Amino acid sequence: MFISKAKYFFQLILSLTFGICGVFAFSPYDFWPLSIISITGLLIIILSNITWKQIIWNTLFWGIGFFSVGLHWIYIGIDQFIPTHKNMNFFLIAFLIIYLTCYSVLFSIILVTLRLFITQWSFLSITAATLWLIIDRLRGNEFIGFPWLQFGYSQISGPIRGIGPLLGVEGITFCLVLISSLLALSIRTVQPSPYYISLIILACLYPLSWIQWYQVQPQRMTTIALVQGNINQHLYWNTENIQKTLKIYLQHTLPLLGKVKIIIWPESAIPGNELAHNELLVSLDYQLRKHHTYLITGIIDSRLINNSYYHHYNSIIVLGNTHDPYKYPSSNRYDKHHLVLCSERFPLQCLFEPVFRFFNIPIAFMKSGPYIQSQLNVYPIKMTASICYEIILGNQIRDNFKLDSDFLLTLANDVWFGCSIGPWQHLQIARMRALELGRPILFCTNNGVTAIINADGSIQSQLSQFISTTLITNISPTTGFTPYAQFGSWWLLIISILICIFIIYIQKNQLFKIFTFFKKNK
């Protein structure tokens, strides 16, 4: 009895360890083989257990290890900038971790159930990869919609990164789980065949990274400056510090007028609402047009509705357009669509907002911009824009992406997460978007990591964190459509589900036997 309990406890610790080691496959560590080890370890453990209790608890420990270490930076943001009790902060992050872990538990329960009648290891491997893909879709789209820490991102510098332009990050994740499940079954059944097949798959996928799906346009090379203000978030919205904040950005910007084509400031670089800074924006726009330089900046836009209340938008605007001088509200803008839960939007917001408005309670609810928006025009450059968290939403970025897009643009403010791994994971996700769509990304943040990302996902240049400085570089736009940009990854999901249905169909005799057995022993 003691040996049995000790073995069970050891399994739980092992599951926790496998979950934790998966985090080190992501940035800033970037040791990509650990993703395979983490998934393989989970599969070996759940396929080795015979009771539902063991399967559920081991998966829980794996998920807690993976998500608590991988997402601990969220607690930093909550603890430093949201005025709630520490116990409440801990409860919020614990709830998020358990919620995300439930998706891993769902995967394990369904996979072990299917294993009862899917007897061939090749069928089980495909089923595991398809099931993981479906669960990842659910985690990324349902309820709070949080697709962070998808294992495909860990391969941005790995040997199967070439799948990115074909099938996106989901395709990479699918192949990772397929390879991991083959390794797990090889170890579990002591058969060499699955192991050899996993090596063959890896060898076949590696040459895909040699294909260049885009064409560089060196004749259109542009000089771009990304300004990293490094503004203290505690002082950001303090009215006494607004002029100081603007002074920092202007000190970096004014000497560059006429020397660079495009200057970029980060998310909400200009404190306060757009209309309140109209005089500054008009004056700055005049100076920019005079020197033939563009400025792209983040700003909060407060629009008066029916002369009674305001709609607030997290926006990006463009100044310096010689074809169209700035005038509020300018059409050359982007309004953030996907708002962050408990920061920019709140649960049941549609119910509470009219109540707060009726009692004149000063709560600044943010509004979403349209899902599909026009590109930013920085003549003759066109950019597909996103703000902060939105860069993780691959489908939204792809749906807004156009064939004539020259660059992808992301403005962010990761000061919330201090010197944690969060900003590095954010940058890694942006690198994957560049690889998927074959376009360079201009990634400008308040305190880092500000970077220029090439169309193949590699980093051309970047700034150190926590300093106020400017990144100036020459970069060429690219053209061309990757297969992922044209078709997305839906067809992978559909084909995988059809294969699984076929597998279940040809295994129907085994399914019937199991059903009969349970019916007799009911």
From Swiss-Prot:
Q: What class of enzyme is it?
A: transferase
Which PROSITE patterns does its entry note?
CN_HYDROLASE
GO biological process: one example: lipoprotein biosynthetic process
GO MF terms held by the record: ATP binding; N-acyltransferase activity
Annotated metabolic or biological route of this protein: Protein modification; lipoprotein biosynthesis (N-acyl transfer)
Q: What is its main location?
A: membrane
**Sorted alphabetically, which InterPro entries does this protein's record hold?**
ABC1_TM_sf, Apolipo_AcylTrfase, C-N_Hydrolase, C-N_Hydrolase_sf, LNT_N
Paired cysteines (S-S): none
Q: Please give the GO cellular component terms listed in this UniProt entry.
A: plasma membrane
Q: What does this protein do?
A: Catalyzes the phospholipid dependent N-acylation of the N-terminal cysteine of apolipoprotein, the last step in lipoprotein maturation.
To which protein family does this belong?
Answer: Belongs to the CN hydrolase family. Apolipoprotein N-acyltransferase subfamily.
Output this protein's name.
Answer: Apolipoprotein N-acyltransferase
User: From what organism does this protein derive?
Assistant: Blochmanniella floridana
Starting at the broadest rank, the lineage of the source organism is: Bacteria, Pseudomonadati, Pseudomonadota, Gammaproteobacteria, Enterobacterales
